[in-house]
């Protein structure tokens, strides 16, 4: 297939591609800057099919470098800038990285690498750019969070990114006024997929270095934005300061990272906020299942239905299986994990769930997080939704604790707000949960342990009870 950025420049050179810190740049201007950077990377010895790590942040330079590495045909390993040096070193070694490009702010996190400043000072050499892309080639690698063990490098091909973009547009549609606000990290698939869609659709990315709910709200009220991607914590922060509806041009608030609770859904309905819930993974190149606003309150807790090119089914043991062209071919240098992840062509998500009679997917739990108590299956998310509905609870995580009588019982860890009353919480649990589902212990903590990508590390909470 024709190189996407080169094709986009030929189709719509004068259309806005990037807005960062108030400055607008067209696709033609972006390409000129990308080509210059590609020449400097080429001068540094970076060639097609080489594994190059990128440690950056949500800024113009990182945005340009992602495109420049693609123009050269290099494979980009996206490093999470929140990781420790030890974690980054593991990924660099595991991926057999040839070179590291690192933002000046993060040079202490790598043993050696080319800083952004050093790259800018490099003399330009005319690069050998890719005119076409083999869709089966690996474009990017991202390591999973490793909540239960060592992270694995997820390979994402150009085909994966292409079909992710096509699936999204078939679901959400496309208009000439569209633009995508990106305040999620571009080293995660949620952010990178926005960049890919921008080029394929020909729409601008409004890139934000940090999530500032007041600034984001101003943008959503300005009429400049049609779509924004958020996770639950970001949405909740927006709702706390948002008093009315957003500008009518905002037609999609795409939520990832788990379904919204009823309270959030009702606020969104009252304020005419077009919330689209989704389910996706690094392995699926972003969203693969979505729930539109019209179904949100009727299907509370559901992630929706599979996007057009994708399929979903439930295995005999309750595991959610996926199939589709956006799904990874496997894990980098890990044939064993790749083989284990697929069964008869279906990708094993590791999540437990079910399809209701209308085909809507409900994700219940990670298989490893399921609590089996006296023969009863207990899903932590069910308990978390009940506890999380109490406004004095900021965050909650439920895990299983070994029990001599029942095998395992649920216990809860909570972060509380002012006004918390344990008696009120116990009443809520007794009213809404079967007795065997009520946490046998509730521990108040200052914060929940999380990975660099914000996922709760349940294994660390389990360790607190096993020690």
Swiss-Prot record:
PROSITE patterns: AMP_BINDING
Major enzyme class: ligase
Residues forming coiled coils: none
Catalytic activity: 2-succinylbenzoate + ATP + CoA = 2-succinylbenzoyl-CoA + AMP + diphosphate
Gene3D superfamilies (alphabetical): 3.30.300.30, N-terminal domain of ligase-like (3.40.50.12780)
Pathway(s): Quinol/quinone metabolism; 1,4-dihydroxy-2-naphthoate biosynthesis; 1,4-dihydroxy-2-naphthoate from chorismate: step 5/7; Quinol/quinone metabolism; menaquinone biosynthesis
One GO term (biological process): menaquinone biosynthetic process
Keyword ATP-binding belongs to the record: yes
SUPFAM superfamilies for this protein: Acetyl-CoA synthetase-like
Record carries keyword Transport: no
Enzyme Commission number(s): 6.2.1.26
Keywords from the UniProt entry: ATP-binding, Ligase, Menaquinone biosynthesis, Nucleotide-binding
Family affiliation: Belongs to the ATP-dependent AMP-binding enzyme family. MenE subfamily.
Cited PANTHER family: ACYL-COA SYNTHETASE (PTHR43201), MEDIUM-CHAIN ACYL-COA LIGASE ACSF2, MITOCHONDRIAL (PTHR43201:SF5)
Gene name as annotated: menE
Name of protein: 2-succinylbenzoate--CoA ligase
Superkingdom in the source lineage: Bacteria
Protein source organism: Listeria innocua serovar 6a (strain ATCC BAA-680 / CLIP 11262)
Alphabetized GO MF terms: ATP binding; medium-chain fatty acid-CoA ligase activity; o-succinylbenzoate-CoA ligase activity
Protein purpose: Converts 2-succinylbenzoate (OSB) to 2-succinylbenzoyl-CoA (OSB-CoA).
Name of a matching Pfam family: AMP-binding
């Amino acid at each position: 297939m024709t190189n996407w950025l080169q094709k986009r420049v030929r189709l719509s050179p004068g259309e806005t591609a990037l807005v960062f810190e108030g400055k607008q740049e067209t696709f033609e201007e972006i390409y000129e800057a990308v080509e210059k950077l590609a020449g400097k990377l080429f001068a540094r010895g970076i060639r097609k099919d080489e594994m190059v790590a990128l440690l950056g942040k949500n800024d113009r330079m990182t945005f340009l470098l992602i495109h420049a590495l693609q123009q050269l045909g290099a494979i980009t390993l996206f490093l999470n800038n929140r990781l420790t040096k030890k974690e980054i070193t593991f990924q660099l070694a595991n991926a057999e990285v040839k070179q590291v490009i690192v933002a000046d702010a993060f040079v202490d996190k790598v043993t050696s690498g080319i800083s952004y400043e050093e790259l800018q000072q490099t003399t330009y050499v005319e690069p050998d750019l890719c005119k076409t892309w083999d869709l089966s080639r690996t474009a990017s690698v991202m390591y999973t969070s490793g909540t239960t063990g060592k992270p694995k490098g997820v390979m994402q091909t150009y085909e994966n990114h292409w079909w992710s973009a096509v699936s999204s547009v078939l679901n959400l549609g496309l208009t000439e006024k569209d633009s995508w606000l990106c305040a999620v990290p571009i080293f995660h698939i949620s952010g990178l997929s926005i960049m890919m869609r921008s080029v394929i659709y020909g729409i601008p990315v409004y890139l934000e270095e940090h999530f500032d709910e007041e600034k984001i709200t101003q943008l959503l009220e300005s009429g400049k934005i049609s779509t924004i991607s958020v996770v639950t914590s970001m949405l909740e922060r927006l709702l706390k300061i948002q008093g009315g509806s957003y500008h009518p041009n905002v037609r999609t608030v795409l939520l990832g990272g788990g379904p919204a609770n009823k309270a959030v859904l009702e606020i969104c309905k009252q304020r005419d906020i077009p919330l689209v819930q989704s389910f996706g993974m690094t392995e699926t190149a972003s969203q693969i299942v979505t729930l539109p606003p019209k179904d949100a309150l009727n299907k509370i807790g559901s992630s929706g239905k599979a996007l057009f090119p994708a399929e979903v089914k439930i295995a005999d043991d309750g595991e959610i299986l996926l199939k589709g062209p956006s799904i990874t071919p496997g894990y980098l240098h890990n044939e064993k994990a790749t083989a284990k992840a697929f069964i008869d062509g279906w990708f094993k998500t590791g999540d437990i769930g079910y399809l209701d009679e209308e085909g809507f997917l409900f994700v219940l739990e990670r298989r490893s997080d399921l609590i089996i108590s006296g023969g009863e299956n207990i899903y932590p998310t069910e308990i978390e939704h009940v506890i999380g509905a109490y406004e004095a609870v900021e965050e909650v995580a439920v895990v299983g604790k070994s029990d001599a009588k029942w095998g395992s019982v649920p216990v809860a860890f909570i972060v509380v707000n002012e006004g918390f009353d344990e008696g009120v919480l116990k009443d809520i649990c007794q009213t809404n949960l079967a007795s065997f589902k009520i946490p046998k212990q509730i521990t108040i903590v200052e914060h929940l342990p999380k990975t660099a990508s914000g996922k709760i590390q349940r294994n660390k909470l389990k360790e607190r009870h096993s020690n």
